[in-house]
Amino acid sequence: MMKRTVLSLLSATLMLGSVASHANSPAYVDSKEYKVLVDPTRFASNPSSAAATLLTNLSARLSTLGFDKTITGNFAAGDRDTLAYYDTPGTCPLNKRGYSVRTRAGDDTDIQFKFRHADEELSYWTDVSGAGKNKETKLETDVTPGNLVLAHSTKQDATTTPTTVAALIKLFPGASALSDVSTSSLSKVAGVTVTQQEYDGPVSDIGESVAEFTLTLWYIDGAATPALAELSFRVGADADKYFTTPVLTRSQTLNAAIGSIGNGWNIANDGGKTSWLYAYRSSSYPNGFCN
């Protein structure tokens, strides 16, 4: 009888421990990415040195916010790729309906079809399926200053670049929601090609998950200096698809810090890289890519 009582108490304790560590509901999303645009002119002459200064200033800001963890590691040059986004000039039906298409070549080579919306369930249930090889689909929370959306995307091997919406639907059957504009042509957004240089390395152990930091620089049409700089950190769900309360709380502190680094780093922005590119006024589209 005593043995049975002890075993029952032990089982109850283990169950309570499990509930305590996973008090939140399982998440729809695979990860959360927090991002902010910073002043690109700071990276014009020596990006590596500027990245180190940025990290030092960020750590100082976290200290003033009472962050109870630390950032370890340093930024080092990582993947370098050539990107292009595609939509229909003027009408921009993909962007207006929450979709985007991006090709990538270089250290990573693929094509991605993405749907973004503030409603988690709508984003989750929107079809973004692909028909290519090595498909990878994910649902991620994208957080920028003043905005939060759920991004549902599929990337796959890039075999061709779609020149019409109909061609896009063949690559990604999930794009059939755009069948009413299937004859529309697709061109590079803003008429430009982007060279993307990433710097990664810094991490912060925030509990059951790790925050991984990335600095991304965009160079337009082979320019020598970057036109865009983004600081971001990604937090993946734990092995059981949970984000614990301590992880979420510390993520919010990190988010507050990247949005208020100080020392002239932050610039007024609200939409992230893709929105920035759609608003970019190039020589090909001096009045803007979309009407």
Language model segments and positions:
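Bacterial N-terminal signal peptides that target proteins for export
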Residues: M1-L9
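Hydrophobic alpha-helical targeting segments used for export or membrane insertion
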Residues: L10-S11, M15
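N-terminal signal peptide c-region/cleavage motif recognized by signal peptidases
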Residues: S18-A20
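Phosphate-end processing signature that detects enzymes handling 5′-triphosphorylated RNA
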Residues: N24-N291
